[in-house]
Amino acid sequence: MSVSRSELREKIMTILYQIEMYNKSKFEYKVEDIIRENINISSDFVETIVNGVIEKRNELDEKANGYLTDWTIDRLDNLGATILRMSIYEILYTDTPKIVAINEAIELAKKYSDENVRKMINAVLDKIVNE
C-alpha cells in the first residue's frame, strides 16, 4: 500500500494533535502506540517528524513566537499550532524542500483551520525560510 507524503503529513498532524490532547488531559500513552493506531504501515518519515516535534517542541515554539506579532503559539487553536510546529520542524530538520513544507502546511491549514490561522502559518513559515 503506497501512501503519499501529503497523506502521511495529515497522519502526523493527527498523531501530534492526539498527543497534545493526551498531554493536556494528563493521559498516559506511548508515542509508538499512537503512531500504530493512526497508520498501519511503517514509516520512518512519520516517526522522524513525530518524535522530532515532541523532542524539540520548546525550540519550535520559541521559533514561532519570534515571528508571531502580538501573539504566541499557545493562542492558536490546537490544530493550527500542531501544523505550525510540524512544518517548522520539517523546514529546519529534514531535507524536504522548504517550498514543499510550506505548501503542505498551507493545504492542511486550509482543510483544518480558519483563514486567519492559515495566513498566520504562511507568514511565520515564510519569515523562517527567509531569515
Cite the ranges covered by each PLM segment:
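N-terminal interaction/assembly modules
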Residues: M1-E131
